Amino acid sequence: STVMNTRSSDILKGPQWANVRALYKADGYAEEELGKPMIAVVNSYSTVCPGHVIFKNLSERVREGIQAGGGTPVEFGVIGACDGIAMGHKGMQYILPTRQMIADSIEAMAEAHRLDGLILLGSCDMIIPGMLMGAMRVNLPTILVNGGPSLPGRMKEGNPYGGEYIDHSIIQESEGALKKGLISEEKFKWIEDHAMPSIGSCAMLGTANTMGCLAEAMGIMLPGTAAIPAVYSERLSVGYKSGKQIV
């Protein structure tokens, strides 16, 4: 069979690279896996940011897709801070620098290990831009798989915006209404508990969803995938298809 010449094969073929193969085998990789394209799965999973909780399970489907496509997945993590949790206090000073840290991490890992392609798992404000910056630096085949938006909350009566649906952005507006005595504390608490009823990026026209749609328009995601809600099963199949496509 024909052996594909890749960046990773430059450090995996020949007796002079036995030490590298031994290290991968220590990770649990089989000999045959080391002759395939080595695809990075860049995972920003955490239980801090609701837009990133999904990646614990989604990354598994991505790895399965890479294997089905004839590649070998190599997963590593990057940070993913939540702008919403950091907002309104000193923590916000740390958010913008994380974009650079993410880009630096991707560049360092992809170049240090001579990886052949990237699957980027990210959803939120600084994470997608940081990932795209890192991908552009290394100039490798890249597909972004975002986590998708949260489902909206439902507020059948008393919605100050009208209509039936609400999202996380209504909470700050409601805080002002509470201070003015326009809504009760009970109503305010209800909004807090129901405005964001699932994991996913905040379901509003913010940076997270905007960057996801932009990445799709740029051709860095599979078509029609940016706005699939995080809790839909289709999200998992998108991960599999993206992993298979990158190879």
Predicted regions and their residues:
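A short N-terminal beta->alpha junction/helix N-cap motif
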Residues: 7, 11, 29, 46-54, ...
